[in-house]
């Protein structure tokens, strides 16, 4: 893949790649959060929430890939290490031990961060 020729300023390229990597990290952590909640949700609203969390993690996974490809297009290096994504992300991981209401609240907070 070649770099975008209109972005000839290396500083601008690095800043854009860094901002996109921040988005990749937050999207990746949100993706895993949604998948974790998909696996572990219980309660009266299990069915709809199980489906909702699946939709979120599938959509976010696709978005994460698009962001990483844009990083490469501006000449950057896409963060591919889970530890790097977790340390960079403003979205926090969760172990999945939460009520359905707590999961909804955490997912809304993660979406707002994105």
Residue ranges and their predicted role:
Residues 2-8:
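Short, charge-rich amphipathic alpha-helices with coiled-coil/heptad character
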Residues 9-15, 81, 99:
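General structural signal for secondary-structure boundaries
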Residues 10, 45-54, 93-102:
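Glycine-rich tight-turn/loop motif centered on a GG-T
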Residues 12-41, 103-114:
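Alpha-helical bundle segments that constitute or directly flank the non-heme di-iron/ferroxidase center
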Residues 17, 50, 54-57, 61, ...:
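Non-membrane alpha-helical structural segments and their capping/turn regions in soluble enzymes
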Residues 19, 65, 69, 86-114:
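Acidic/histidine-rich alpha-helical segments that form the ligand environment
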Residues 35, 82-87:
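Mobile beta-alpha loop/short-helix "lid" or hinge segments that flank ligand
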Residues 41-84:
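Conserved alpha-helical segments that form or flank metal/cofactor-binding pockets of metalloenzymes
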